[in-house]
Amino acid sequence: PFYLDIGFSKEQIANIAAAFGLAMTLGGAALGGFMVARFGIAPILILTAFMAPATNLVFAWLAYIGPEPQGLVLAIIADNITGGLAISVFIAYLSSPSNTAYTATQYALFSSLMTLPGQFAAGFTGLLATQLGWIGFFCVTALTGLPAIILAFALLKLAHPDHVARPGID
């Protein structure tokens, strides 16, 4: 409802999302794989921890400027590149401590756990958006990314994914 509420037509949304959505997600995933291979998991995990809330600020900006097609293109590109990048880095991170004998099981468990907070919060987002308006909503959701940033830094101190022995490999 966000895009429609700020004045985009269904046709505009479909055309722009179709033109940029999947390609940017795949591009983000490929970029994430390249960056993890080049720089390691840790710095890219930190980068994506910052990028995800920043993407929400792009949506706040889009709500502010209104139905500008270039704004929608930028928001979709930013969101999908960030999503693709983040999921590829998160998969690399989840795979890093896994015992190779149980990688599929551990990945299934961890990736399912990853979706729980979002599923829980989804029930409240409509109410929050109604109460705060779209700009306030996206600013608040950007702030909810701060714990992830703090956790990413704490994770690096406790168990740096690029330096931890992998059971079954090391």
Residue ranges and their predicted role:
Residues 124-147:
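A membrane-interface helix-boundary motif in multi-pass transporters
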Residues 50-67:
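C-terminal ends and interior cores of transmembrane alpha-helices
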Residues 27-44, 129-130:
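Helix-to-loop junctions at the C-terminal end of transmembrane segments
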Residues 142-170:
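Multi-pass alpha-helical transporter architecture, strongest
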Residues 84-99:
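Intracellular juxtamembrane helix-capping segments at the cytosolic ends
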